[in-house]
């Protein structure tokens, strides 16, 4: 395994129980002291830092040295939680990402036993229920459906599903000539709206295919490389070849070479290249129902932020890639991309009430808005993303009808976004038999600690019973799952990934999930997005700078007037600015940034603080945002920050926001993203793309985007004083050595160029769609058994829970 101390121990001993048992024999007094201390804390749950703190307090430092190289300390450091129900202490041990073991120690008798997942979850349930629940409890277990399906075993393989799948299935399917027939049948069946592509009926066998390809290759070798397809299509048809091989002799020859190589010596990389050249994606539907989805005047509204920006940038990049591939294949087909969202009739000042809206900067992408509907008619009010569940089934039926009218065909790919979009995408893909891709953006279970165990406390406001069930259904139904980072899937050595947290959990009184998802599943693929380079570009590119916007940016930052767009003033405009921009909700933690700034006088001396969030002119109806709004005012008053802080209302103009990042660069400032958890961190990418040194949360995607100390800095939002000290250190260094600012700025730009661009993203997404579409056709990747199980979960559990979520009461104005 070779992945650190935990893996070293794993390779030496067979189980956690044996490791603890051996340690008890070798160091009985020390282990008894630790477990007794944990037991004496009484009934409850301990987090990793609490477990280690109790260990350090129980054993003197000199004695701990004896345990340093032993198994016990490794076990404790790998523990993600401890459940204490005297005289028992149970530990959930995670030696490496995606691998878990469970053990329980009877402290009175010094008995150690290993627990199966259901046993551990049943024990954990006693934290909220009196005594063990011996009644029959629904247990969800998806593992049997995947038992015969290949999966990698190394943590480094997580998120590289398509490479693993290609390697495995290539060797399985293409072990002899006869096994190549699925590929032949796939090419023969390939068509668009009844138009035959690739092969016609003249080719019925592999030998006929190879013969035709060789003759075509021979013919192409007599032509100029740029000879258009129209000049050799008659010869191709005679041979049994149709459109799709290439728009010119050179490209057609390259495609034919790939297929001949594949037929001669099957190879996973050749297969991926070949499938990447075949025209497979013409119509795409992207689902994002909740929030205010529009191209202007919506960012900062409730439930409206990075996801909207992500999708708009995504479709522009996808259209470019689809047009390029279709042209290179020699086809005259117009692709279509539909972003399907909710129609909001009363969203004045936005286009959210408009049924169809063309996406700017594209030719064939549209936003299609479909209203929520009940038996009483169209729902006009904005509805929180936590309360959409009772509307989605009817919404899916309405969307299916609207899509059919717009596309006049089934889509080739359906992409879901967030929990609600993923459920609608899942239902549509299931109904239409279409390739289904899931993008979570954020799984709420990881954002609200213990929201599974204590779900009943959250239910009235958040309805997590519906949401977590939806997430399980969508992630298990999807043909492939895209994440922006490894951490989304499997965290890191210390923290649990978003998807990983769904491997095993319990919602007492509802169900136990003993195997919800496998992070080693080859459906997981890391495909990182970028920033829109027409808006976000380096501050040094002076010829592109929008200097005409500087007067209004200066008004925004430095005006001594307070109004509905900006509150509080900056007394010293010569200081650098630390800047943050996000939705005003608890998880984004902008109030935490204000507090750490308020507590550090030296930081106030060095820099001004500018936060962009909320709307001073239009109070939110979202309860969480209301609470954060009040907290922000209270903190500014408590720390007497007027003169040091500028609080600007959410800014809807992305073009001006791009120049705002660059203007902050001119002040030699920095961007701070202080979220408790951030799935990806699009604002982090935007800031770095503009050259703005960035400090971002260590929890989630930014930890991967930023290389600490090279292209930015990681901060711990739970340790505000340490974060503010890091900021002070940075700005002190910049004062003493101005080149330090430029060094970090340049490091950020280099990091973006290497890994985070939309061009790389769209190329990968199109290839993934082709590869998964092919394997779905030629193998049991369709996972029919899983889908029957999901139908039952949806029909018997989800629908009942969704029906308990209150419907919106019409009559009140439905503004933000």
UniProtKB/Swiss-Prot annotation:
<feature type="region of interest" description="GT-B glycosyltransferase">
    <location>
        <begin position="280"/>
        <end position="757"/>
    </location>
</feature>
<dbReference type="Pfam" id="PF24862">
    <property type="entry name" value="SUS_EPBD"/>
</dbReference>
<comment type="similarity">
    <text>Belongs to the glycosyltransferase 1 family. Plant sucrose synthase subfamily.</text>
</comment>
<keyword id="KW-0597">Phosphoprotein</keyword>
<dbReference type="InterPro" id="IPR001296">
    <property type="entry name" value="Glyco_trans_1"/>
</dbReference>
<keyword id="KW-0808">Transferase</keyword>
<dbReference type="GO" id="GO:0005985">
    <property type="term" value="P:sucrose metabolic process"/>
</dbReference>
<dbReference type="Pfam" id="PF00534">
    <property type="entry name" value="Glycos_transf_1"/>
</dbReference>
<dbReference type="GO" id="GO:0016157">
    <property type="term" value="F:sucrose synthase activity"/>
</dbReference>
<protein>
    <recommendedName>
        <fullName>Sucrose synthase 2</fullName>
        <ecNumber>2.4.1.13</ecNumber>
    </recommendedName>
</protein>
<comment type="function">
    <text>Sucrose-cleaving enzyme that provides UDP-glucose and fructose for various metabolic pathways.</text>
</comment>
<dbReference type="Pfam" id="PF24861">
    <property type="entry name" value="SUS_N"/>
</dbReference>
<dbReference type="InterPro" id="IPR056735">
    <property type="entry name" value="SUS_N"/>
</dbReference>
<keyword id="KW-0328">Glycosyltransferase</keyword>
<dbReference type="InterPro" id="IPR000368">
    <property type="entry name" value="Sucrose_synth_GT-B1"/>
</dbReference>
<dbReference type="Pfam" id="PF00862">
    <property type="entry name" value="GT-B_Sucrose_synth"/>
</dbReference>
<feature type="modified residue" description="Phosphoserine">
    <location>
        <position position="15"/>
    </location>
</feature>
<dbReference type="InterPro" id="IPR012820">
    <property type="entry name" value="Sucrose_synthase_pln/cyn"/>
</dbReference>
<dbReference type="InterPro" id="IPR056736">
    <property type="entry name" value="SUS_EPBD"/>
</dbReference>
């Amino acid at each position: 395994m070779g992945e650190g101390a935990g893996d070293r121990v794993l390779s030496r001993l067979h189980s956690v129980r044996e490791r603890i048992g051996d340690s008890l024999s070798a160091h009985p007094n020390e282990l008894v002291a630790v477990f007794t201390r944990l037991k004496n804390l009484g009934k409850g749950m301990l987090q990793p830092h609490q477990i280690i703190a109790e260990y350090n307090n129980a054993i003197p430092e000199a004695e701990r040295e004896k345990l340093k190289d032993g198994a016990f300390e490794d076990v404790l450091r790998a523990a993600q939680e401890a459940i204490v129900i005297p005289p028992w202490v149970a530990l959930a041990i995670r030696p490496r990402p995606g691998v878990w073991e469970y053990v329980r120690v009877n402290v009175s008798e010094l008995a150690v036993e290993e627990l199966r997942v259901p046993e551990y979850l049943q024990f954990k349930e006693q934290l909220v229920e009196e005594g063990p629940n011996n009644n029959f409890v629904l247990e969800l277990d998806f593992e049997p459906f995947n038992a015969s399906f290949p999966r990698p075993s190394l943590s480094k393989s997580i998120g590289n599903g398509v490479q693993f799948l290609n390697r495995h299935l290539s060797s399985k399917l293409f072990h002899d000539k006869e096994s190549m027939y699925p590929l032949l049948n796939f090419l023969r069946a390939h068509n668009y709206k009844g138009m035959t592509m690739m092969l016609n009926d003249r080719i019925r066998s592999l030998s006929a295919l190879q013969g035709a390809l060789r003759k075509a290759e021979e013919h192409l070798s007599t032509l100029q490389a740029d000879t258009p397809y129209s000049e050799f299509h008659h010869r191709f048809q005679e041979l049994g070849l149709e459109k799709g091989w290439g728009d010119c002799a050179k490209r057609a020859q390259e495609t034919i070479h790939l297929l001949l190589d594949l037929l001669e010596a099957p190879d996973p990389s050749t297969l991926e290249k070949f499938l990447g050249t075949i025209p497979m994606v013409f119509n795409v539907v992207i689902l994002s129902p909740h929030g205010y989805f529009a191209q202007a005047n919506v960012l900062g509204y409730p439930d409206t932020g990075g996801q909207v920006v992500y999708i708009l940038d995504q479709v522009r990049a996808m259209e470019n890639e689809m047009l390029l591939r279709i042209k290179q294949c020699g086809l005259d087909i117009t692709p279509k991309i539909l972003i399907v969202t909710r129609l909001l009739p009363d969203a004045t000042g936005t286009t959210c009430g408009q049924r169809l809206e063309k996406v700017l900067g594209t030719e064939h992408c549209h936003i299609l808005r479909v209203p929520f509907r009940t038996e009483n008619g169209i729902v006009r009010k904005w509805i929180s993303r936590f309360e959409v569940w009772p509307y989605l089934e009817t919404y899916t039926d309405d969307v299916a009808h609207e899509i059919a009218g717009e596309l006049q065909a089934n889509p080739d790919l359906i992409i879901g976004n967030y929990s609600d979009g993923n459920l609608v995408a899942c239902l549509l893909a299931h109904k239409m038999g279409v390739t289904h891709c899931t993008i979570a953006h954020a799984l709420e279970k990881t954002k609200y600690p213990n929201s599974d165990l204590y779900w009943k406390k959250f239910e009235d406001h958040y309805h997590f019973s519906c949401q977590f069930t939806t997430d399980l259904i969508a992630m298990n139904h999807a043909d492939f799952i895209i994440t922006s980072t490894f951490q989304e899937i499997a965290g890191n050595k210390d923290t649990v990934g978003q998807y990983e947290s769904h491997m095993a959990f319990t919602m007492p009184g509802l169900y136990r999930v003993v195997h919800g998802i496998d992070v080693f599943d080859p459906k997981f693929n890391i495909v990182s997005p970028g920033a829109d380079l027409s808006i976000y570009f380096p501050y040094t590119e002076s010829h592109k700078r929008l200097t005409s916007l500087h007067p209004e940016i200066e008004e925004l930052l430095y005006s001594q007037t307070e109004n509905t767009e900006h509150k509080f003033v900056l007394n010293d405009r010569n200081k650098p600015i630390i800047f943050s921009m996000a939705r005003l909700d608890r998880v984004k933690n902008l109030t935490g940034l204000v507090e750490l700034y308020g507590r550090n006088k030296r930081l106030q001396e060095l820099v001004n603080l500018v936060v962009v969030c909320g709307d001073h002119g239009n109070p939110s109806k979202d309860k969480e945002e209301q609470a954060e709004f009040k907290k922000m005012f209270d903190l500014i008053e408590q720390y007497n920050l007027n003169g040091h802080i500028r609080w600007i209302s959410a800014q809807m103009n992305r073009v001006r926001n791009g120049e705002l990042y660059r203007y902050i660069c001119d002040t030699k400032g920095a961007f701070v993203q202080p979220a408790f958890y951030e799935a990806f961190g699009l604002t982090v990418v935007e800031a770095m793309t503009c050259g703005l040194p960035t400090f971002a949360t260590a929890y989630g995607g930014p930890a991967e985007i930023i290389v600490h100390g090279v292209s930015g800095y990681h901060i711990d939002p739970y340790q505000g004083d340490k974060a503010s000290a890091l900021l002070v250190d940075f700005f002190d260094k910049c004062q003493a050595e101005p080149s330090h600012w430029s060094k970090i700025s340049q490091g950020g730009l280099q990091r973006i160029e290497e890994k985070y661009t939309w061009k790389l993203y769209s190329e990968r997404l199109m290839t993934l769609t082709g590869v998964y579409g092919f394997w779905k056709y030629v193998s049991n990747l369709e996972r029919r058994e899983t889908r029957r199980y999901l139908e039952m979960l949806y029909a018997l559990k989800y629908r009942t829970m969704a029906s308990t979520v209150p419907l919106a009461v019409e009559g009140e104005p439905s503004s933000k």
